[in-house]
Amino acid sequence: MIDKSAYVHPSSIVRKNAIIHANSYVGPFCFIDSQVEIGARTVLKSHVIINGLTYVGEDNFIYQFSSIGEENQDLKYSGENTKVYIGDRNKIRENSTIHRGTVQSNKITKIGNDNLFMVNVHIAHDCVIENNCVMANNVTLGGHVKIGNHVVIGGMTAVHQNCIIGSHVMIGGCSGISQDVPPFILAQGNHAIPFGINFEGLKRRGFDKKTISVIKNAYKIIYKRGNNLNNIKKELIKLSESNKIINLFLDFFSNSSRGFIR
């Protein structure tokens, strides 16, 4: 179903049963598969391919030569009808790829709202990306990567499969992420190491001095010489009594499976 107010360029192919909502724009030479749904006011500039069981929300901009919902590159994949979900107000720049999930995981690759993926970003199967993230040119995510809110990843950075990157993290360009990255920190390098708190990012997002001070104390606990994970958790639980922002650290360590960068 194509809404009467949507525009589809005559050179584009929209398969039967695809759904395109009101005031969307499908530019020249696009391909929309039969199980795709595109939300209102979403723009496909040109030469965009959207395959498989894929939902694209409202007010997204997808630029030329991007591929969304294609079969993933996991060697175990054998054609299962897995999904891609993309929220609202995302910008997906040229040549970016977002692959569908696998049955070995949650069957879905999921993108939140208000993200910017710059040129040549690759998001592999089963990744989960929250909201307000920026990935610069040529960022590559392996399968099953989980990224929190307000994360900035510099260009040419590669993230190993199954890694977790906590909310409000900033990662410098040309980095290699092979372990989990705790919330609120700066990291860079190959392999990436921590460089303190993302103070500038927190100030821009309106964190007050008291909260930033508590986050700084959490950082000192995590990276105190000789502190093991059990002690870290105990000290963070105690610190969380003064500010619930510390729960982001506690949730991170509860879900971390690859160890964290040091």
UniProtKB/Swiss-Prot annotation:
GO terms for biological process: lipid A biosynthetic process. It is found in: Cytoplasm. It holds the Pfam family Hexapep. InterPro entries: Acetyltransf_C (IPR029098), Acetyltransf_C_sf (IPR037157), Hexapep (IPR001451), Hexapep_transf_CS (IPR018357), Lipid_A_LpxA (IPR010137), Trimer_LpxA-like_sf (IPR011004). It catalyses: a (3R)-hydroxyacyl-[ACP] + UDP-N-acetyl-alpha-D-glucosamine = a UDP-3-O-[(3R)-3-hydroxyacyl]-N-acetyl-alpha-D-glucosamine + holo-[ACP]. One of its GO terms (molecular function) is acyl-[acyl-carrier-protein]-UDP-N-acetylglucosamine O-acyltransferase activity. Pathway: Glycolipid biosynthesis; lipid IV(A) biosynthesis; lipid IV(A) from (3R)-3-hydroxytetradecanoyl-[acyl-carrier-protein] and UDP-N-acetyl-alpha-D-glucosamine: step 1/6. Keywords: Acyltransferase, Cytoplasm, Lipid A biosynthesis, Lipid biosynthesis, Lipid metabolism, Repeat, Transferase. It comes from the Bacteria. The keyword rRNA processing does not apply. One of its GO terms (cellular component) is cytoplasm. Its EC number is 2.3.1.129. Transmembrane segments: none annotated. Belongs to the transferase hexapeptide repeat family. LpxA subfamily. Involved in the biosynthesis of lipid A, a phosphorylated glycolipid that anchors the lipopolysaccharide to the outer membrane of the cell. Homotrimer. This is Acyl-[acyl-carrier-protein]--UDP-N-acetylglucosamine O-acyltransferase. The gene is lpxA.
